[in-house]
Swiss-Prot record:
Paired cysteines (S-S): 47-95, 168-217, 264-334
Protein name listed in UniProt: Fibroblast growth factor receptor-like 1
Glycosylation sites: 107, 227, 251, 289
Listed GO CC annotations: cell-cell contact zone; Golgi apparatus; Golgi membrane; plasma membrane; transport vesicle; transport vesicle membrane
GO molecular function, one term: fibroblast growth factor receptor activity
Compartments reported by the entry: Cell membrane; Golgi apparatus membrane; Cytoplasmic vesicle, Secretory vesicle membrane
Keywords from the named record: Cell membrane, Cytoplasmic vesicle, Disulfide bond, Glycoprotein, Golgi apparatus, Immunoglobulin domain, Membrane, Receptor, Repeat, Signal, Transmembrane, Transmembrane helix
Length: 529
């Protein structure tokens, strides 16, 4: 436990030193800013920087960043390597090292010497030969081509009026010289001011047929010589119209809503103009603002994409048709034209029918939904109101003052019994009750006579209220019998309740005999029970 404070103090003391180590990049060694290199040799420029965190380095030459596109330059972790230096490689080189705390720059000035005697110049530790000349540097080097990848194409064909550049980049020790020849004859005259824009490149512009031939570059120094030959063919332009090659365009079928394309190949001495046209069908001329006449038929010009040049000297163009519809079906032609004329070829496009079934007519639904909401709601409501009014009127007109007795149905006979006494005055199955309803007049009260009763009839006023019209209906009930009091005659049949009896009974009560047959006539109900 006693060692813990001491260990803690030791760790705390080490923290400042660790923080002090972190910082911007710093120089790890001295450099010689002035570097001298011989032509055609390899140069290495060091960038001795360090830091925590480790810095990232970037090289520039005369303010331009050196990247992988510079074929003879290679950026290494420890510096920059330049192979087979040329005179154009001379300049100011800067190595810039950067981390999260800052940056540091290391500057070099590179001088390229054409020929140097031993001991006359000391390129320094950063140079290609160190502090003193080695035996290899004192020897001569034969010339050699440094960019053979740019010399692979030795046969070049160009049309009249075009240009061509022939390259023969080489290096050697001492610095080699280059000489150009045509058909084994030395070129003594420059055809243009930019004929030799660079030392190792021959530029031929505005070619003419007489410029065709073999061009040879000869590179030599004291150690030897090398050469390379190019064959240039200047093609005389033939004055002819373009020719459509191959079988395209061809007839094509596409699904409804699908995508397809036509293609067209045109051979021409110069880059032609390729245009796609679509024939205007009969009756649809008014839908197009402008048309052209080809072969006696009218066509509309379609948008055309880029024209691609092919290695065989032909030109290619494609027409893309996306989301095909029935309107896209028809004849298409590819037209190739130049200053000498034009050629064309036609093809047909067929669009298959839409597999989806047609939907309901849109015009009918739009006209229905276009009505205002009050009209849509009010028309059915008004119809319901009118229908209800008509039904109510019909119900009112069906009500009659009193139906004739002869038209009422005759129910079955129910003999009098003791059930009448049990139910009291509420249920009178054996009473003969005739009801005659008349609207708007007060009739006689009801007379209910029990059999064998000598007391006067009980009076039960009946008042019906119509729930629809709120009018009061008075009913009169009369006791009917066929025989006299004490008679043993059978109950009178209901056939005696004819119109004459009813007309006589409605104003007053008449007794016909023993109350053995009960008949209840209701005007509103239209039945006899």
């Amino acid at each position: 436990m006693t060692r813990s404070p001491a260990l803690l103090l030791l760790l705390l003391g080490a923290l400042p030193s660790a923080e002090a180590a972190r910082g911007p990049p710093r120089m790890a060694d001295k450099v010689v800013p002035r570097q001298v290199a011989r032509l055609g040799r390899t140069v290495r420029l060091q960038c001795p920087v360090e830091g925590d965190p480790p810095p990232l380095t970037m090289w520039t030459k005369d303010g331009r960043t050196i990247h992988s596109g510079w074929s003879r330059f290679r950026v290494l972790p420890q510096g920059l390597k330049v192979k087979e230096v040329e005179a154009e490689d001379a300049g100011v080189y800067v190595c810039k090292a950067t981390n999260g705390f800052g940056s540091l720059s290391v500057n070099y000035t590179l001088i390229i010497m054409d020929d140097i005697s031993p001991g006359k110049e000391n390129p320094g530790p950063g140079g290609s030969s160190g502090g003193q000349e080695d035996p290899v540097s004192q020897q001569w080097a034969r010339p050699r081509f440094t960019q053979p990848s740019k010399m692979r194409r030795r046969v070049i064909a160009r049309p009249v009026g075009s240009s061509v550049r022939l390259k023969c980049v080489a290096s050697g020790h001492p610095r080699p010289d280059i000489m150009w020849m045509k058909d084994d004859q030395t070129l003594t005259r420059l055809e243009a001011s930019e004929h030799r824009k660079k030392k190792w490149t021959l530029s031929l512009k505005n070619l003419k047929p007489e410029d065709s031939g073999k061009y040879t570059c000869r590179v030599s120094n004291r150690a030897g010589a090398i050469n390379a030959t190019y064959k240039v063919d200047v093609i005389q332009r033939t004055r002819s119209k373009p020719v459509l090659t191959g079988t395209h365009p061809v007839n094509t079928t596409v699904d409804f809503g699908g995508t397809t394309s036509f293609q067209c190949k045109v051979r021409s001495d110069v880059k032609p103009v390729i245009q796609w046209l679509k024939r205007v069908e009969y009756g649809s001329e008014g839908r197009h603002n402008s048309t052209i006449d080809v072969g006696g038929q009218k066509f509309v010009v379609l948008p055309t994409g880029d024209v691609w040049s092919r290695p065989d000297g032909s030109y290619l163009n494609k027409l893309l048709i996306s989301r095909a519809r029935q309107d896209d079906a028809g004849m298409y032609i590819c037209l190739g034209a130049n200053t000498m004329g034009y050629s064309f070829r036609s093809a047909f496009l067929t669009v298959l029918p839409d597999p989806k079934p047609p939907g309901p007519p849109v015009a009918h639904s739009s006209s229905t939904t276009s009505l205002p909401w009050p009209v849509v709601i009010g028309i059915p409501a008004g119809a319901v109101f009118i229908l209800g009014t008509v039904l109510l009127w019909l119900c009112q007109t069906k009500k009659k003052p009193c139906a004739p007795a002869s038209t009422l149905p005759v129910p079955g006979h129910r003999p009098p019994g003791t059930s009448r006494e049990r139910s009291g005055d509420k249920d009178l199955p054996s009473l003969a009750v005739g009801i005659c309803e008349e609207h708007g007049s007060t009739m006689a009260p009801q007379h209910i006579l029990a059999p064998g009763s000598t007391a006067g009839p009980k009076l039960y006023p009946k008042l019906y209220t119509d729930v629809h019209t709120h009018t009061h209906t008075h009913t009169c009930t009369h006791t009917l019998s066929c025989g006299g009091q004490g008679s043993s005659a059978p109950a009178c049949p209901l056939s005696v309740l004819n119109t004459a009896n009813l007309q006589a009974l409605c104003p007053e009560v008449g007794v016909w005999g023993p109350r053995q047959q009960v008949g209840r006539i209701e005007n509103n109900g239209g039945r006899v029970s």
